[in-house]
């Protein structure tokens, strides 16, 4: 799930308000949900990037991608 710019702006707005005057219970809950969505999005993007990496030994030119990563790539149709 991608997070929108509006959601990031709202996270920042709530953070500023929390510092300045505090948040209501509803705002604290909203902030927690938005932060969780943001972290989930970052983790998913990071995982997606890592799962497409192919590691090559500089000296030999051999594929030295870890077996666990190769298996994930096969499962996702990115390897033979």
Curated annotation (Swiss-Prot):
**Does the UniProt entry include the keyword Cytoplasm?**
yes
According to its UniProt record, where is this protein mainly located?
Answer: cytoplasm
* Annotated keywords: Cytoplasm
Q: How is this protein named in the record?
A: UPF0291 protein YlaC
Which cell locations does it reside in?
Answer: Cytoplasm
What the record says about family reads:
Belongs to the UPF0291 family.
Tell me the superkingdom of the source: Bacteria
Give the source species.
Lactococcus lactis subsp. lactis (strain IL1403)
Q: Name one GO cellular component term.
A: cytoplasm
